[in-house]
Regions:
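Conserved, mostly hydrophobic/aromatic
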Residues: 37, 89, 164
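N-terminal small/glycine-rich loop or linker at the start of catalytic domains
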Residues: 1-26, 121-133
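Active-site-adjacent beta->alpha loops and helix N-cap segments on the catalytic face
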Residues: 53-63, 80-88, 93, 106-118, ...
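Catalytic beta/alpha-barrel core
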Residues: 46-53, 74-82, 99-109, 128
């Protein structure tokens, strides 16, 4: 891995203002938050549109084009449980400054996200969990191995294109 990467995580529908802006296709709040994160040193911006069951593909395309069009093709992490929306975002993504990130795969219900990243020459964030958070490091390693093997089956460069998140819990 060549460098430390900072991913800005403030473009998420979990924030009421962002949810409203995405729903209404209001660019100003989104652009303002994006600029704040980039000014603070973010390398990538995470675009979390939530499940977006009704209009996910259109919304993700709109968000990708908005952000890359206003911020010189800023690299993005596409974050949603809607696979069609991630595919749509990748279809309009400009790779001039970096590959898209598929956020995120796990060793259970989202293993297909590794396949999606591999098929689109994208990076994948791979959460070292399955049905829940791993109870110990051995379980984390088991999940990581499952994800890594899946990526290798598709010819992914595991060192460059699979970013593992061990999901460590806070120690009290």
């Amino acid at each position: 891995m060549a460098k430390f990467v900072t991913i800005g995580e403030r473009l998420s529908t979990t924030a009421p203002a962002v949810n409203k802006a995405f729903s209404e296709r209001d660019p100003e709040p989104i652009l303002k938050r994006a600029k704040q994160q980039l000014d603070a040193g973010a390398t990538y911006l995470d675009v979390n549109i939530g499940p977006a069951e009704n209009d996910g593909p259109e919304l993700m395309k709109w968000a990708v084009e908005l952000l890359q069009g206003n911020f010189d093709n800023v690299p993005l992490a596409l974050d949603t449980s809607n696979v069609a929306a991630i595919e749509a975002g990748i279809s309009v993504y400009n790779r001039a400054k970096g590959k898209p990130i598929v956020n995120s795969a796990d060793a259970s219900g989202r293993l297909e996200y590794v396949d999606l990243a591999a098929a689109n020459d994208a990076i994948v964030i791979a959460l070292c969990n399955g049905e829940g958070i791993a109870k110990d490091n051995d379980e984390r390693m088991m999940y990581m191995q499952t994800l890594m093997e899946r990526g290798m089956e598709h010819g992914m460069d595991v060192a460059e294109d699979m970013w593992f998140d061990p999901l460590f819990l806070v120690i009290k």
